[in-house]
Amino acid sequence: MGRYTGPTCRLCRREGMKLYLKGDKCYTDKCPFARRGYAPGQHGQEKKKLTNYGMQLREKQKLKRYYGVLERQFERLYEEAERMKGITGENLLQLLERRLDNVVFRLGFAASRPQARQLVSHGHIEVNGKKVDIPSFLVKPGDVISVREKSRSMELIKNNLEVSRNVPDWLELNKDAFEGRVVSLPRREHIDLPIQEHLIVELYSK
């Protein structure tokens, strides 16, 4: 299945939570989800009781859309999470957080993950001084993520950095240098996401 190209705000309403897909608009009263926080469509306001399977599937879809990953990418990450030591659900969240497009967003270089994905794909981002244009690239502790020298004059990036956003504890930002550093691996308490990851594990365990 290809990437979704329809109205992004409908995805937030479908999943019942803000996915922060439209940047600054998501933080204002203009956000459609803030005004209509129910599912789209004729029967969107009706309360439907989900089956256990339906709840598991909903959590998976929610997580996929939050990070903007496709089904096959998600499956590969889940398989890797299973092979890692520790709790599979938390491992999965850690891998998703470590994606370069997510880190570019978390550091504030981009206003949304889709925008961050575009910055990476268009070659505006470096990791340890080398251009990386793969959004799914996984960062590790010690990595330095920076905006390329020739891209630092972009109004988009400068405006994004002027907005005050919380940078998670596992990352460190130097606004003046247009760079951030991965201090440690992200832990579950660093990920402020209302996801019941154990439901996703149950789904894949069937």
Swiss-Prot record:
Domain S4 RNA-binding: from-to ranges: 98-158
GO biological processes: ribosomal small subunit biogenesis; translation
InterPro entries the UniProt entry points to: Ribosomal_uS4, Ribosomal_uS4_bac-type, Ribosomal_uS4_CS, Ribosomal_uS4_N, S4_RNA-bd, S4_RNA-bd_sf
This protein's UniProt keywords: Ribonucleoprotein, Ribosomal protein, RNA-binding, rRNA-binding
Example of a GO cellular component annotation carried by this entry: small ribosomal subunit
Record bears the keyword RNA-binding: yes
Pfam families referenced in this protein's UniProt entry, alphabetically: Ribosomal_S4, S4
UniProt cross-references to SUPFAM superfamilies, sorted A to Z: Alpha-L RNA-binding motif (SSF55174)
UniProt GO molecular function: rRNA binding; structural constituent of ribosome
HAMAP family xref list: Ribosomal_uS4_B
Quaternary context: Part of the 30S ribosomal subunit. Contacts protein S5. The interaction surface between S4 and S5 is involved in control of translational fidelity.
Family membership: Belongs to the universal ribosomal protein uS4 family.
Main function: One of the primary rRNA binding proteins, it binds directly to 16S rRNA where it nucleates assembly of the body of the 30S subunit.
Protein name: Small ribosomal subunit protein uS4
Organism: Thermoanaerobacter pseudethanolicus (strain ATCC 33223 / 39E) (Clostridium thermohydrosulfuricum)
